[in-house]
Design a protein with these regions (language model features):
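Short hydrophobic/aromatic helix or loop-helix immediately within or flanking a transmembrane segment
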Residues: 175-202, 206, 210, 214
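Start-transfer (signal-anchor) and selected internal transmembrane alpha helices
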Residues: 19-52, 80-142
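Helix-to-loop transition at the C-terminal end of transmembrane segments
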Residues: 62-71, 137-160
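Specific aromatic-rich, kink-prone transmembrane helix
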Residues: 262-280
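Membrane-interface alpha helices of multi-pass inner-membrane proteins
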Residues: 281-310
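Short acidic/glycine- and proline-prone juxtamembrane loop motifs at membrane-interface regions
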Residues: 255-260
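Transmembrane-helix signature of polytopic, membrane-embedded enzymes
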Residues: 223-246
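Transmembrane-helix motifs of polytopic, lipid-linked glycan transferases
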Residues: 210-230
Length: 314
């Protein structure tokens, strides 16, 4: 709320939002049309599962609106005085998007992009990316409703210290960590969060909520990648990816400003390396330091994973 309070903020947001949505939507629709004929969406169960995600998002949004003191409708509405400017900017951006799409097709940029490794990853993991994005939005709504600057106590639920971590991660002038079990958060979590805060202006407290929600969506994507590799069945992997994202623990700790979701993300990344049979110390050691730096005790789970994978130390 109150993040966009200048004319240029409204113009930039409207144009960026519309351009991103139109360009991304165009290529997603093309991909979906192909998938319906011969791909992931060719299975009716997959279509049903894909459609449940927007329904879940709408349901969580409506539930949050039932608590106006926690999630006022003003959080997501464009101020009335800026509505005309927002609409005009969106129309201009939409027209610009058409021109950009024509140039992309004319110069064959899309065909060149199809040959890149990034496109290959997106193509193979689009269901997981889609699920991760929807859960990012769900957790963002919950994070905005749950977290508050009015918190002045620790251990609000399951030892989650939302108030101090909101400040540790996002307060512009810095904040004392006072937690020896999280040795590297000031050079991992905080820089990432403060980068997001650069775009939030005076509303720095929004950046921890966004970063937590982004990590939540990322863990959903990593769950999809892990399961797809393990079972070689897209439908099975997608079902359990949705179950993973919709669990109460993931929805809660993917929304509260704490270290839990960052710890989960680093652990899952390490497990993906193990699953890929990664043996290079140049990769494993930095990944292990990241796990250790978020929460010291998490390194034990990484070591257990390496042990059972028979890395080859003996």
């Amino acid at each position: 709320s109150g993040t966009m309070y200048e004319r240029h903020h409204i113009i930039a947001f409207a144009m960026l939002f519309t351009l991103t949505g139109s360009l991304g939507g165009y290529f997603l629709i093309r991909r979906a049309a192909h998938s319906l004929k011969n791909g992931f969406l060719n299975n009716w169960l997959n279509v049903f599962l894909v459609l449940t995600l927007p329904a879940f998002f709408v349901a969580m949004f409506l539930i949050s609106l039932n608590f106006p003191t926690m999630f006022p409708i003003g959080y997501i509405l464009v101020p009335t005085e800026w509505l005309d400017l927002y609409t005009c900017s969106s129309v201009i951006a939409g027209a610009l998007g058409i021109v950009i799409l024509e140039q992309i097709e004319k110069h064959g940029l899309y065909q060149k992009l199809r040959q890149s490794k990034l496109f290959g990853f997106i193509k193979e993991n689009l269901p997981g990316i889609y699920a991760g994005f929807i859960f990012f939005l769900v957790n963002l709504i919950l994070a905005r409703a749950i977290n508050s600057l009015r918190f002045n106590i620790h251990s609000i639920i399951f030892e989650a210290d939302a108030e101090p971590w909101l400040n540790i991660m996002g307060y512009p002038d810095g904040y004392d960590v006072n937690r020896a079990v999280h040795p590297l958060v000031l050079i991992t979590m905080r820089p990432f969060t403060r980068f997001i805060g650069f775009f939030m202006g005076e509303n720095w407290f929004l950046s921890p909520m966004i970063s937590i929600s982004m990590m939540s969506g990322l863990t959903v994507l990593m769950a999809w990648v892990f399961l797809k590799r393990a079972v070689k069945n897209d439908t099975y992997a997608f079902i359990f990816t949705l179950l993973f994202g919709a669990t109460a623990s993931h929805l809660l700790f993917g929304s509260i400003t704490e270290t839990y979701i960052f710890g989960m993300a680093t652990l899952m990344f390490f497990l993906l390396l193990i699953q890929a049979d990664e043996k290079r110390f140049s990769i494993l050691i930095p990944a292990g330091l990241l796990v250790f730096g978020i929460t010291i005790t998490n390194i034990g789970q990484s070591v257990i994973g390496l042990f059972f994978n028979k890395l080859g130390f003996w």
